[in-house]
């Protein structure tokens, strides 16, 4: 595996928190989890410096996938003029993301049976094909639109890996006191890529000028098309570099496992699904994640369409989307680091986050209805409500992932997170499907946000948490 990557100084024993007992009701389940440990094997507990390189490569791949997925939403007005896209085309380009999750279970099987390296290489190769397809120079606009749609489909097929594999990577490479942080970084970078699309697109691609004379409009259309193609070529180059790096070095696992949980045996693929579908607590918390995050992801993808009726420009909509996701990424990583230090507090963190999400989404929805509510509709209020909503919802993702794995351990991490992200994308896909037909008036979409956040808050409140994997690492290992 390349032992030259680490030295004695780079290897250490993981910090097993002092005196941490299991959550109420977790003792029996923790002992059952301990039963899956192998009778003999290498003593776990080593972490390697190369784990940060593996995390960096995976995070860059997730960043690029989010960037490519959200290429068209922030520049939808320019794309309409350059490629004669309709509102249905823009919504469909965003919809290819959740549609790409349909073969999610195949990628989960591949991750469970063949490991991280093969899955990541296949994912990055699909992204190379997808971004390359969008760059093929053709003069026929109809053919060009088909190539763009095909490229977005292939990029959507990369979604299951970048969204599901973060907890698997953190368990495989990181110790118990670093897992939540590693999960947050790996899972948040996909959202950060989508945020950068809000920034890169409107800054590189100029907005169309509908009042220009005919000859000037034709020249402007060619200029806009050239700038869009510049973005497409740049994204293709970035994806090719990441694919080359993962092909050169991306080991499937470290020489020695970093924790007891990483060394333990897991349930089979079939038994894992039986365990998940029969666990009511898991189904409850899975819906608490899937419904609001699916609604918010679809809402973010068409944010420009939603803000256009309230006279928000393409550039302002891009900045609002950018800061809402960036804020969520920063707070999410900070929350995960806090969860690594103060263990057993995941439910409380989620309750606080979704209380804030419910209030901020209600504020935004009522602000957009200022003709009825008479609330001030200003740039400041739109920025504040959208950014707070993004911070509260996006930062909950790594906390949810850790809670999923703790709840159903020893079900493999990739299968657990694959099921919940599939559900999330299913809800997102259903909403975007309606957007493709009802894209002229989207105020109904805004009301889906506070409703889904409130439902999730109630589900989390009724959820009974347990920490089976943490019990195994901290108590059984001691």
Swiss-Prot record:
Cleaved in lysosomes by cathepsin L between Leu-214 and Ala-261, generating a N-glycosylated N-terminal and a non-glycosylated C-terminal fragment. Disulfide bonds: none annotated. A motif (Di-leucine motif) lies at residues 15-16. Coiled coil: none annotated. It is a multi-pass membrane protein. The gene is Slc49a4. The lineage of its organism: Eukaryota, Metazoa, Chordata, Craniata, Vertebrata. Residues 73-89, 139-152, 206-229, 303-314, 369-384, 436-442 are lumenal. Belongs to the major facilitator superfamily. This is Solute carrier family 49 member 4. It catalyses: pyridoxine(out) + n H(+)(out) = pyridoxine(in) + n H(+)(in).
């Amino acid at each position: 595996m390349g032992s030259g990557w680490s030295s004695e100084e780079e290897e250490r024993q993981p910090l097993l928190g002092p005196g941490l007992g299991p959550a109420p009701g977790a003792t029996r389940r923790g002992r059952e989890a301990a039963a899956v440990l192998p009778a003999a094997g290498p003593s776990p507990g080593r972490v390697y410096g190369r784990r940060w390189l593996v995390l960096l490569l995976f995070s860059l791949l997730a960043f690029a996938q989010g960037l490519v997925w959200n290429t068209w939403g922030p520049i939808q007005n320019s794309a309409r003029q350059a490629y004669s896209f309709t509102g249905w085309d823009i919504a469909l380009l965003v919809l290819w993301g959740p549609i790409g999750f349909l073969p999610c279970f195949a990628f989960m099987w591949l991750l469970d049976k063949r490991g991280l390296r093969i899955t990541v290489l296949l994912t990055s190769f699909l992204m190379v094909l997808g971004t390359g397809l969008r760059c093929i120079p053709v003069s026929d606009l109809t053919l060009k639109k088909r190539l763009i749609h095909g490229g977005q489909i292939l990029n959507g097929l990369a979604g299951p890996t970048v969204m599901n594999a973060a907890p698997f990577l953190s368990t495989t490479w990181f110790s118990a006191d670093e897992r939540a942080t590693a999960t947050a970084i790996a899972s948040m970078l996909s959202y950060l890529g989508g945020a950068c699309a809000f920034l890169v697109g409107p800054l590189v691609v100029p907005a169309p000028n509908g009042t220009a004379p005919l000859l000037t409009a034709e020249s402007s259309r060619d200029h806009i098309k050239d700038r869009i193609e510049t973005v497409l070529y740049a994204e293709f180059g970035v994806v090719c570099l990441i694919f080359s790096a993962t092909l050169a070095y991306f080991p499937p696992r470290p020489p020695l496992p970093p924790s007891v949980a990483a060394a333990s045996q897991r349930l089979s693929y079939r038994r894992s699904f039986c365990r998940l579908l029969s666990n009511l607590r898991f189904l409850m918390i899975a819906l608490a994640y899937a419904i609001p995050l699916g609604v918010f992801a679809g809402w973010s993808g068409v944010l420009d369409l939603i803000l256009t009726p309230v006279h928000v420009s393409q550039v302002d909509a891009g900045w609002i989307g950018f800061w809402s996701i960036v804020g969520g990424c920063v707070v999410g990583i900070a929350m995960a680091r806090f969860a690594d230090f103060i263990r057993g507090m995941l439910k409380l963190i989620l309750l606080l986050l979704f209380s804030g999400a419910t209030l901020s989404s209600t504020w935004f929805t009522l602000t957009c209805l200022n003709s009825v509510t008479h609330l001030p509709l200003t740039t400041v209020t739109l920025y504040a409500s959208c950014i707070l909503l993004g911070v509260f919802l996006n930062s909950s993702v790594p906390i949810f992932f850790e809670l999923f794995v703790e709840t159903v351990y020893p079900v493999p991490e990739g299968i657990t997170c694959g099921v919940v992200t599939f559900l999330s994308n299913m809800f997102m896909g259903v909403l975007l499907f309606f957007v493709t037909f009802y894209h002229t008036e989207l105020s109904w979409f805004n009301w889906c946000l506070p409703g889904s956040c409130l439902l999730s808050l109630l589900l989390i409140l009724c959820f009974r948490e347990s920490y089976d994997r943490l019990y195994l690492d901290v108590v059984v290992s001691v």
